[in-house]
Swiss-Prot record:
This is Histone H2B.11. Disulfide bonds: none annotated. It is found in: Nucleus; Chromosome. GO terms for molecular function: DNA binding; protein heterodimerization activity; structural constituent of chromatin. The modification N6-acetyllysine is found at residues 7, 27. The lineage of its organism: Eukaryota, Viridiplantae, Streptophyta, Embryophyta, Tracheophyta. Its main location: nucleus. One of its GO terms (cellular component) is nucleus. Residues 1-39 have a biased composition (Basic and acidic residues).
Amino acid sequence: MAPKAEKKPAEKKPVEEKAEKKPKAEKRVPGAKEGGGEKKGKKKAKKSVETYKIYIFKVLKQVHPDIGISSKAMSIMNSFINDIFEKLAQEAARLARYNKKPTITSREIQTSVRLVLPGELAKHAVSEGTKAVTKFTSS
């Protein structure tokens, strides 16, 4: 085993160096953080949440202008729309897979609407969807 190196006692600095005055600390601006990897003035980005609340409210005002909606009812309606869209997307994906097509087109969506929604509701949804696609392609 190698011999251990001898440790020398730390040398003391002369008193004169300690007596020097340190510069005063700069005044800090509130809100500006100076840290390791942080950028100045940047706040944590808020995670965006997509909802259908504004569209539900617009439709409600078209149908019944004098009626309001509670936040709990709005949340239920938002969940309902998400569930329906999820079912339609799953059915459209299944149809595309059956037909060995890599793309979901308006035809798959239309067929999935006919399969998922009952009777009269499916007919109205298909007619409104066809009208929307026609308007989109013509513009």
